[in-house]
Amino acid sequence: MFGPQLLHVDDPGGGRSGPVSKIMRRRPAQAQLPRIAADGRGRERRPQRNSRLEVVAASYGLFTKRALGASTKSGTHFGTSTRASSSPLSFANAMWQDGWMAADSEHKSISARALGIALSAAALVPHFTTPAFAHASERGYVMLLPTGYYVVGGAVAVAASFLVLAVLPPRLLERISASRLPIGQFGDAARIWISTLAFAVLAILVAAGILGSRDPLSNPLPLTVWTLVWVGLTLLQGVFGNVWSWTNPWYGPWRIFSSVFPAFRDRTMPQGLAYWPALILFASFAWFELIYPAPEDPARLAFALMAYWLSTFVCMIIFGYEGWSRRGEFLSAFFRMVSRFAIVETTPDHPSEGRALSLCWPGAKLWSAQALPASGMLFLLLTLSSVSFDGLSKTFSWLGANGVNPLEFPGRSALVGINSAGLVLMFIALVAVFFAAVFVGERLAGSISFGKAVGLLVWSIVPIALAYHFSHYLTALLVNGQNALVAISDPFDRGWNLFGTAHMNVGAGVIMGSDAAWIIWNFQAAAIIGGHILAVLVAHGLAFRLHPARSRAALSQFPLTVFMVAYTVFGLWLLSTPTAV
């Protein structure tokens, strides 16, 4: 299986025995860390970064003493080995090598491989306590749960969903997709004010990025961009609909501008551009988030946001707000696609008209979606491939395959070339496999409408992309969401406490310990499995639009279901495999 049972060791701080499942790189529960005396400005200083993980650095000796005893069969003493005595890093390398040697030792109840990884990570953590400009997804723990059962079970569940859907009558799916429950109406005036307020908040955050703390965990700009917007708002879009259409920082300023200069109000975007601008911009965003060495540096992020907001506003003036927000501005295009999975529907979807709200089944709006052009298909597949590569790029397997010792992680700067190539290759591989699955399915069904089929069936990627987004960023959202609450009370690092949260203890314990590990893993695994099952359901509903005959529709979906089963296994493996950061 992919992981052994949880290890139990003594807690060096309290003497209590408990399972060890995670090792945090970032901010632990501050309740365990005494605050330092007031600084020159009369406010409390936060603990220095180098002291945050003292307990982890000090505990690896107890790990070895408890788990392995005084020696192994080979006579190597982990606690006093010459290789392990010079530094935590050399100790980590010793664990990396000796962990495999102990695989056939007398300790049959503990997987030596997983133990070596866990001890190595514990020894390595102190070497990464300096400020790290990474992005929100770094989970920094080693999963030691018996995850192989979940992988097999998830694959079986997705495959079984195909068999169940293959015998369902098409009319049942049509009734489900068409059912709506009206819940009210609203006008558009409030949207202008909310968007204008969002623009003002963005301006304050940009100023905080330039003038505030350089610590990404203390500055509200990177926490807002990478945690609250990119993680939290994406999930809100998938549940409640297109919230971004109200909260984006362009709509209000554009309405004000177009009222002053009405000649620009009815501009349209050329159809030939399709989704290519959004595709290019999202590829740049993904590279900045995943590859660029310092995406969380507040000042750099602030200047990047200023340039992007201004260039986007100019494009909206030239091409019209509606056209550019649908197919040019990548966040709006992505959020609009994701919102098709939501349980809330707004109609009509036009900025100048009132809207009616109604409830629907999750994913029901995807069944009525129109086929995407080639650029739209590539855009949607890129959103999934980028988050998938983000998980892959941190794994021991990826780093080892590229000649990088995962226990001596050199940092992003040394991996720019490798990871840039990997990001492109992951995208190409996903496109090739998805297109091949649709092509083979259409041939099996006796159809030659490949272009229309792939443009329609690509909408089934939306539930998978949402599931990966949730699972991949869950731990970051739980911890960095708290950091954001702290940072917004003192955006300029002046000792303020605007909202009463500046001195709030950030509880990393919410994701630490055996109970938390078990709960989080089950949520993540359930999201991955559930997302793929819903993707199979959406694909079947779309297939009936292409092939009214139930047998042909089911036959066309067989290769795509195989692809989704394989991607389920891949996603669960990404969650369970050891990572370097």
Predicted regions and their residues:
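Alpha-helical transmembrane segments and their helix-start/interface "positive-inside/aromatic belt" motifs
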Residues: 113-114, 146-153, 184-196, 222-230, ...
